[in-house]
A protein has these predicted regions:
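N-terminal redox-cofactor-binding region of secreted/periplasmic oxidoreductases
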Residues: 2-640
Length: 640
């Protein structure tokens, strides 16, 4: 039988030769070893896919006259964070026929989606939509890159403050969304893996038998612990666990969705297991883009009856359109960008905009595409004087290539080493009016309070064991640097999403209106001040090279700048932290009701981050999973 140890022994031998004979073996030899390792490991682990790309198995071509279209009880449009949950939970009832349609493919054999440290490799890749915002008028008039995965699944973990969900309940007029009622769905999906390195976490406060494994990454970068201790010394209290009734305020190591083998967990891997995909009443279609939902308007109230979808070839040729019927409901789960786009392409949206693109108006719904919000962020970078950052992940020398091979071996064989890191290993959540961090004698504390409650933070600093210009654009190869990402959790700026055309293959116009309000600039400047304070507080002083000469890619000089000068830097550098929400929001003036039914229609719901009426003071993926769990229960009770 073939053994992984054989692979290790042979590749380790290659590594030793490379180190011993650097003058005769090049970086290409090192790269070849890496490729060999990945090919062998992929061969050993690949599974036969149960996903469908032959659409005739689940639907019929629209062009075929006189055919009966395939029928399903529920059609779920979009296999992202929410869609996979819904498909799994609804198909638990063998009497319900469920069809899930995803524009991308499976993430299970895409290495960057499974290796924790490699998520940035998905950006600007074939698995990314390559989206850009409209020019941001208050942020240098730049178009901002918005990475959006084109794969089944997706996840991250820090849920927000309890008062965030109480605020949702008030907006929705439904107390089932309050923390006391909604948090049970967080516990339902969680499977916490206790870690002896972190005894402060109370397992009784976490879910233990859900499908989504959650815990701490196997690798801890030395700067991670230094950041936590420096944050405490700067005045931010230690938090035993961000994901309890105490909320997110404080500093600690970040939990993430990761299993015991150090593989990233997504809702595809957690919910669409082999056993689930084997259910005869569930089919999952991939590489198919839904162009519109169709309605029966004969009763006067539009009722969703079917969806149309197609695919593109590698030569960009659009294939035939297929149609499938939904006898009960269509659930749109395309995310904050694609869900409103699909609704508008289907005739549900602002009438004037639909008519501009010659789309027949099924329902004038002005709120579709409105209320677009995102967590804006700013990176600051410092030289790491310990030489322990992850700069070798982009090899620039024989030595860094050897280090990368070493780390690939450690990760693929034992699930350890830097590749098991989630990069942003430690975090600090705090308020911009914290009088310990920002003493009244030094700071003007009359900032607008945009938080959901007194214990909810509005700023987050993420400590990263490496540095980039933005997203996945690397710094100079030989520069050993780390970065702090300052995230504005409760912006007051709101934008919108509009159609560019009636073509479903054309990206919509996305304008988050970053930094439109003075509040957002002022709070981010204060966040930069806090990050600088942490970077220059012991024991971070053992990591930060505070005496480094000025470098155009480093930010040691920021401490000497005025607030006005920092505001200019904030406007220049602001980027997305990948959390858009709100474009199909709940609420009195929103798109959906508290059971996520599209108002003014029948048989149509939306379930993803687009229904969130406000941003949480954490990361939204956990709330999306819980929302899908909640909706699955609502639907199963409705059709029991």
């Amino acid at each position: 039988m073939f053994q992984c140890s054989d692979v290790f022994a042979k590749l380790l031998g290659v590594l030793k030769v490379i180190k011993a004979r650097p003058t005769t073996l090049s970086l290409e030899a090192a790269a070849a070893s890496v490729v060999a390792l990945m090919i062998v490991l992929r061969y050993l682990t690949v599974k036969q896919s149960k996903l469908i790309t032959d659409y005739s198995k689940v639907a019929r071509k629209v062009a075929d006259d006189g055919v009966e279209f395939d029928e399903w009880d529920f059609i779920i449009v979009g296999g992202g964070t929410a869609g996979c949950v819904l498909a799994s939970r609804l198909s638990e009832d063998p009497n319900l026929r469920v069809l899930l349609i995803e524009a991308g493919g499976s993430s299970q054999n895409v290495a960057p989606s499974k290796i924790p440290v490699a998520f940035a490799k998905l950006m600007r890749s074939p698995w990314d939509y390559h989206l850009y915002t409209e020019p941001q008028k208050h942020a240098g008039n730049k178009k901002k890159f918005w990475p959006r995965g084109k794969l089944l699944g997706g996840c991250d973990a820090q849920y927000g403050a309890p008062s965030d969900f109480d605020e949702w309940a008030e907006i929705a007029g439904d107390q089932s969304w309050s923390w006391n009622n909604f948090s049970k769905y967080i516990r339902k999906f969680e499977k916490y893996n206790p870690d002896p390195r972190f005894p402060h976490v109370d397992p009784l406060l976490r879910g233990v038998d859900g499908p989504v494994e959650i815990g701490y990454s196997a690798h801890i970068w030395p700067g991670s612990k230094a950041f936590i201790d420096a944050s405490i010394n700067a005045g931010i209290p230690f938090s035993p666990d961000f994901c309890t009734t105490k909320g997110t305020k404080g500093t600690n190591k970040a939990m993430t969705y990761i299993n015991s083998k150090s593989t990233r967990v997504t809702t595809e891997s957690a919910y669409l297991t082999d056993d689930v995909l084997a259910r005869p009443n569930l089919k999952v279609v991939t590489h198919a883009r839904v162009s519109k939902v169709l309605f029966d308007t004969s009763s006067g109230i539009p009722r969703a009856t079917s969806v149309e979808f197609a695919s593109k070839s590698r030569t960009n040729k659009v294939g035939p359109t297929f149609r499938a019927r939904a006898t009960k409901e269509v659930i749109v789960s395309g995310g904050a960008i694609h869900s409103p786009q699909i609704l508008m392409l289907s005739g549900i949206g602002p009438a004037a905009q639909l008519l501009r693109h010659n789309i027949p108006v099924v329902l004038d719904a002005p709120s579709v595409g409105a209320n677009l919000m995102d967590h804006p962020s700013v990176n600051i970078r410092f030289r790491d004087k310990t030489g322990s950052t992850f700069h070798h992940f982009t090899p620039h020398s024989l030595n860094t290539a050897c280090l990368l091979i070493r780390d690939l071996l450690r990760y693929n064989l034992w699930g350890t080493g830097p590749l098991a890191s989630n990069v942003g290993e430690s975090v600090a959540f705090f308020r911009s009016d914290d009088q310990v961090l920002f003493p009244p004698a030094e700071y003007n504390n009359d900032l607008e309070d945009a938080n959901s409650g007194p214990d909810a933070p509005d700023l987050e600093v993420i400590m990263c064991a490496g540095a980039v210009h933005s997203h996945n654009i690397p710094l100079s190869p030989k520069l050993q640097a780390y970065q702090m990402m300052i995230v504005l959790l409760r912006p007051t700026s709101k934008g919108s999403l509009l159609l560019k055309s009636a073509d479903p293959w054309e990206h919509p116009l996305m304008d988050p209106s970053y930094l439109e309000t003075k509040h957002d600039v002022d709070v981010l400047v204060r966040g930069v001040r806090a990050a600088l304070k942490i970077a220059h507080t012991a024991p971070m002083t053992s990591i930060t090279d505070v005496n480094a000469s000025h470098h155009p890619e480093l930010d040691n000089h920021l401490s000497s700048l005025s607030d006005a000068e920092l505001a200019d830097i904030v406007r220049d550098r602001v980027e997305s932290v990948y959390h858009p929400i709100g474009t199909c929001s709940m609420g009195a003036g929103g798109v959906v009701d508290s059971e996520l039914r599209v108002k003014g229609t029948q048989g149509l719901r939306v379930c993803d981050a687009s229904v969130f009426p406000k941003l949480v003071s954490g990361h939204p993926a956990g709330a999306v999973i819980a929302t899908a769990e909640k909706l699955a229960d609502i639907i199963k009770a409705r059709y029991a």
